[in-house]
């Protein structure tokens, strides 16, 4: 077929509503023209007498599918009877069962990998389940080919575990949905499209990349799409139409184009975490010092909230069974560990469970703040997952605060000659400059100092670019755009401040050095009190 795109329809669980499905397909084709293929995931057959009678009309030839239809094998014991073979076969005219697992390659070169059924939890495996051997038999021949780049389409009955990581959230909480074996399969096969069913949910995840930025060659992106059940009462989407040119027929430059909303691969972290969990399963005594002991009188109107979080007795503490990873301990006095006597507590604005916000000492502006972990972590890439999650909440809340004041938030971190993470959050008045002006100022001044400041995709996980221990400087703009520089030597410690204080941004060059901006303790207390009051409507920690 050359470079002519194939027109494909994908469908969720049919559950025996075959007439309803094909009536819908006929209507689509009447309106939009003929499609080449229909792919069905989840349970195709139903177990009711009505469903059996409906199928009989297609099996006998009294009715015919209006399009070449490929379905997965059984995903429940009740429907095994409809499949004469686990190896795949034609069940009726225009309806083909692909089988338990394998690769289907069409005349056009379109490559479809598939795994039918649910993950087996017993031996011998029931006929509607797949085993680790099935996964190995599918993956091994493909990965042994040095020219393997991925498959065009992956069809699975079950969801991959952790697919929502880094992505948009589905309509219902699917955090513990799916299985790790399918996640591992998707990570290895790198499908351009991955369809799954069984959950009765429609979810189109943001596309994710299959390479590590700045460390691996650019590869094509993957899209995961879960589809609902045919004719579901909530009218959730169960059919998905798309055009696809087989990978083997595509120009490599076109194939690896990255959409703007691409995210990190959701499965790499899952695999790493899985290994860590297995390695540390016996470590039950490591427990992070609870943040509930850190309560200061921050001059709030309601003294019982004590900065805003309820005091929790040992018996009242939620998630008491959780034992988060203990952060590294400082080797000496630390000015930023919240439990440390060195902390200037009058500067604290808000305290969460794992992070806190404090007024910057000698700030660029009166509302310049620091976002910091309560425990001793050196950089963003060192943070435990629960700390990262709360740090993101603080970033989001402070951005909303800035927007309400007619300002845009610029975040930057210098992981160089510092022992405790300080994420600088600086509000820049919108009338002063645009986001593009700020970006250009950073790029220009970096170039002047012979530093290669690189723009990286908005959803990039810094851990993949800068492993723990790597000195770096990074900026995050209000649009989500990020700039990154791997520090080599002689990095100017005030670089972030100098750029924001420059004529091109806020035009306050005299404030580029924090030591020149120090004020009395009394003035600091007044500033902190004002920021605390202004920020209060956005402080999620007050509700915890």
Swiss-Prot record:
Top-rank taxon: Eukaryota
GO biological process: mRNA splicing, via spliceosome
Regions of compositional bias (Basic and acidic residues) in chain numbering: 266-279, 521-535
Parts of the chain that traverse the membrane: none
Gene Ontology molecular function terms on file: RNA lariat debranching enzyme activator activity
Pfam family, one: CwfJ_C_1
Loss of function: phenotype: Morpholino knockdown of the protein causes reduced swim speed and abnormal touch-evoked escape response. Morphants exhibit abnormal cerebellar structure.
GO cellular component: post-mRNA release spliceosomal complex
Ranges for region Disordered: 255-331, 521-544
Disulfide bonds: none
Family: Belongs to the CWF19 family.
Name this polypeptide is given: CWF19-like protein 1
Species whose genome carries this gene: Danio rerio (Zebrafish)
Lineage of source species: Eukaryota, Metazoa, Chordata, Craniata, Vertebrata
């Amino acid at each position: 077929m050359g470079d002519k795109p194939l027109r494909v329809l994908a469908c969720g669980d049919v559950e025996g509503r075959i007439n309803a499905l094909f009536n819908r397909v006929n209507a689509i084709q009447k309106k939009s023209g003929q499609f080449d293929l229909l792919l069905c995931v989840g349970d195709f057959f139903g177990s009711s007498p009505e469903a059996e009678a409906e199928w009989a009309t297609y099996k006998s030839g009294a009715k015919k599918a209006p399009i070449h239809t490929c379905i997965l094998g059984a995903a429940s014991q009740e429907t095994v009877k409809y499949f004469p073979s686990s190896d795949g076969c034609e069940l009726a005219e225009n309806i083909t069962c692909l089988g338990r697992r394998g690769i289907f390659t069409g005349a056009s070169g379109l490559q479809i990998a598939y795994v039918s059924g649910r993950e087996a939890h017993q031996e011998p495996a029931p006929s509607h389940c797949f085993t680790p051997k099935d996964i190995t038999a599918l993956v091994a021949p493909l990965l042994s080919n040095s020219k393997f780049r991925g498959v065009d389409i992956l069809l699975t009955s079950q969801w991959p575990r952790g697919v929502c990581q880094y992505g948009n959230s589905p309509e219902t909480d699917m955090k513990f949905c799916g299985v790790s074996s399918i996640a591992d399969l998707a990570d290895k096969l790198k499908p351009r499209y991955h369809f799954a069913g069984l959950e009765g949910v429609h979810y189109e995840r943001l596309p994710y990349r299959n390479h590590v930025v700045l460390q691996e060659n650019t590869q094509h992106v993957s899209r995961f799409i879960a589809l609902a059940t045919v004719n579901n009462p909530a009218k959730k989407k169960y059919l998905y139409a798309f055009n696809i040119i087989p990978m083997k027929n595509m120009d490599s430059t076109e194939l690896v184009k990255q959409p703007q909303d691409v995210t990190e691969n959701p499965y790499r972290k899952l695999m790493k975490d899985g290994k860590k969990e297995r390695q540390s399963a016996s470590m039950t005594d490591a427990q992070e010092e609870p943040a509930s002991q850190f309560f200061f009188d921050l001059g709030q109107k309601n003294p019982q909230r004590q900065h805003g979080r309820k005091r929790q007795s040992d018996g009242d503490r939620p998630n008491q069974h959780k034992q988060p990873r203990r952060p590294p301990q400082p080797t000496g006095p630390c000015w930023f560990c919240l439990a440390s006597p060195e902390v200037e507590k009058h500067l604290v604005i808000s305290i969460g469970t794992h992070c806190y916000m404090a007024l910057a000492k000698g700030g660029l502006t009166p509302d310049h703040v620091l976002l910091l972990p309560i425990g001793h972590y050196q950089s963003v890439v060192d943070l435990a997952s629960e700390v990262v999650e709360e740090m993101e909440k603080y970033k989001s809340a402070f951005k909303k605060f800035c927007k309400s004041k007619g300002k845009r938030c610029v975040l930057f971190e210098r992981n160089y000659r510092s022992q405790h993470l300080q994420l600088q959050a600086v509000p820049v008045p919108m009338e002063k400059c645009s986001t593009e002006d700020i970006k250009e100022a950073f790029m220009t001044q970096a170039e002047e100092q012979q530093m290669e400041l690189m723009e990286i995709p908005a959803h990039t996980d810094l851990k993949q670019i800068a492993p723990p221990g790597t000195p770096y400087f990074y900026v995050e703009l209000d649009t989500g755009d990020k700039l990154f520089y791997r520090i080599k030597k002689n990095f100017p410690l005030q670089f972030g401040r100098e750029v924001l204080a420059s004529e091109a941004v806020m035009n306050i060059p005299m404030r580029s050095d924090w030591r020149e901006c120090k004020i009395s303790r009394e003035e600091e207390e007044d500033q902190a009190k004002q920021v605390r009051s202004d920020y209060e409507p956005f402080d999620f920690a007050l509700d915890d």
